[in-house]
Structure formats: C-alpha cells, structure tokens
Amino acid sequence: MEFYLSSDCASLARYVSKVVYLEDNDIAHIYDGELHIHCSKIGSEDFLFRTVQKLELELSKIKKGPYDNFMQKEIYEQCETTKNVMRGRVDAFTNRVVLGGLENWLTELRRAKRIIMIASKSSFHSCLAARPIFEELMEVPVNVELALDFVDRNCCIFRNDVCIFVSRSGETTDTINALNYCIKKEAVTIGVVNCSGSSISRFTHCGVHTNTGPEKGIATTKSYTSQYIALVMIALWMSEDLVSKIERRKEIIQALTIVPSQIKEVLELEPLIIELCDKKLKQHDTFLLLGRGYQFASALEGASKMKEISYVHSESILTDELGHRVLAVASDNPPIIAFATKDAFSPKIASCIDQIIERKGNPIIICNKGHKIWEQDKQKGNVVTLEVPQTVDCLQGILNVIPLQLISYWLAIKKDIGVDLPRDSAMSAPDI
C-alpha cells in the first residue's frame, strides 16, 4: 500500500480517493505498508483512531482545460463559483437566507454584542468589504483584524463576542493561532473556508463552506468573491429577526441572485483591458488606486493583486486622503485607477477625479454603465472608463474587483511573468 503526505488535499486528487486528516499533536508512523497514528502529548493514549474520509474532488476541476493558465481559468469560473456559494442558501421567492452550518448556534450568534472578523491577505480584504453591511444590518460594533497583529496584541475577547475566521485554505497559520486564542477566551467562532476538512473548519463551532472548488493559482481570485458573498449571507442570516431591516434585506437578496450574470457582463471587458494594458499600462511601474466606502476594500484587493502578480508598486488610497502629496505624484502621470460606481460617496469621488484631470492626470475610471459624467473628458482622451453593471452598494465591490483581476493578469502576461507561480510566494506552488 502506498501513502502520500500533503498539506493540501487538492494536490492528491490524481493519486488517491481517500484521505486521513491529522490533528494537532498527532504523529503519523508509516512502516511496512501500515499507518499508525500516535499522540505526542504525555499521558494520552498511545494509539489513536482517525476516520478515513472520501476525497470529493473532481480531477477535471484541477486542470486548466482550454485556458492558458489557472489564474485565467479561475477568473472566468467566478460566474459559476458565485452561484455555488449561494446554491440552496439564498431563496429569492421567500427573501430568506438559510445557513444550515450555523443553525445549531442560532441563539448565541444573534445575541452577539460584538463581531470580530479575523483573516490574512485577500481574506482580510473580503472582511473589510463586508464590514459595513454587518454594521448596518446587525447594529453592533464590528472589528476587522489581521490575524498576526490580533495575536501579537493579545486582544480583549469576551464570551458574548462572535469571531469569524476567513481563510481560503483553512490552514492559514496566523488565522489558526488567532482561532486557538479565541477558543481559550470562550468566544463563539465561525469558519468561512473553502476546504471542508481543514483545521479552521474542524476547530470552529460552526461555519459556512464557500463551495469554490480547488484554486490552483497562487493569486486569490474566485475565493475572494465567494468569501465576500458568504460574509454578506451571514450578515443577512444573523439579522433576520430585525424587523426594521426587512426591506434592506430583500433588496440585497434580490441583487445577489443576479450577481453571477453580471459577472459575465464584466468579463466582456477583457478585450478593452488587453488593449489598455498593451498601449497605456505595461510601461509603468507605479499605480495608484482610489476608493471610498465599500470600494476601499476593492482598491486594497486590486493593489495587492498588482503587486503579487504584475510586480509593480501599487498603492490604495481613500479618495478624501487625496491631499497635495498624492496630487503631486499624480502630476507625474502614474496610472490612477478610481472606483466611481454609484453609491453615497459618488459626488465626493467625482470631485477627486476632477482634481486629477485638472492636474493633467489621466485616470482610469471604473464606473457603472450609462455613467455620462466624464463623457467629454473621455472624448478628449483625458480618461478611460471601464463600465460595469450596477447593483446594490454592498455587492458592487464583487463586480468592481474583476477588472482589477484582469488588469493584473494581462499586465503580467505582457511582461512575460508566470502568473500561476509568482516569485517569492509564501504559499505552496500549484501542480502545473
């Protein structure tokens, strides 16, 4: 009998059909075709039993198919993965969200006095994107914490806190350390992960599986949008007993149902983005991204992707922080990408963009279809617009981040960079 060892079950899909998950302090001893599991803790039983589980991964899902690389494949899979995370959970006819993985903890979750979302990297950005809707629907304080910093500070955690841990793999070391800390403080914990057998999914009290499927590319693309939707669904579910929020919840639930088709519309921008990267962007090594409100998280995620995949310096800035220092840089004509889709902050964002144009900047504006405010500037060649469908404000970031994924991808391709295996990555390399 052969045994394979891996930190990621997806890498084993082509070799095995059954897996055994080791837990903390387990020691696996393989000898002469046999597996024995022991515990390293003093006083524990010498031999342990761990359940053999079926590995439910389709080999076709971890192949590139007709795409050139995994990142491109996974960007295009977002039409389907956003459906998967909502399938069986969002009911547009009754305007309800059903999350079976949380039902047993309903009472404890709805009496939360504070919600803390803890994550790292792109998962941290998805938490930032969802924070405003949690605050609006739940009417309780909501904190978003970087997992490493959270543990370093020994944050105050109380028994009536609800801590949400978000991770693509479910094995992020810093996030697991934060989870262990919160468990010791007796807080209620929720896991939002893609891998059902992962450490975070097993150690949290309850959770939501994002059903994203394997993500072989190093860059987080489809997991980001699936996490975003999963967090919005949790906010909708936890606020179901608030009568004052009924109409707002209906609006969001109806908008959720058409997000997959709207993503398909956004992906139609790819030819324009390829041309934009080829003619205007590939010669630059500094980018500025502007956003406010829900779109600041989009700016953070977009800047992160450009650094990680395209190897360019990119900085995300709140639009009202566009002071003289940033405007002085803008006059040197680095590409500026501004999120100007319709929401409560649209007038102020428009004012900032006008200041950039006055200083001879040439911003790239992500706006809604039919937005005519910069039509004259567009005809003069002062701006470039990337038009995306309009949706409810708390979901607009799902659509807005996809042009940035495509820009990062095509900038890397134009520079002959391997997008599936960026240099100096701290994550495990995909099986390419």
Swiss-Prot record:
Protein name: Uncharacterized protein EC1118_1M3_2531g
GO biological process, one term: fructose 6-phosphate metabolic process
Keyword Cytoplasm: no
Entry annotated with the keyword Cytoplasm: no
InterPro entries: GlmS/AgaS_SIS (IPR035466), GlmS/FrlB_SIS (IPR035490), SIS_dom (IPR001347), SIS_dom_sf (IPR046348)
Superkingdom field: Eukaryota
Gene Ontology MF term list: carbohydrate derivative binding; glutamine-fructose-6-phosphate transaminase (isomerizing) activity
PROSITE patterns on file: SIS (PS51464)
Domain SIS, chain residue ranges per copy: 105-244, 277-422
Keywords: Repeat
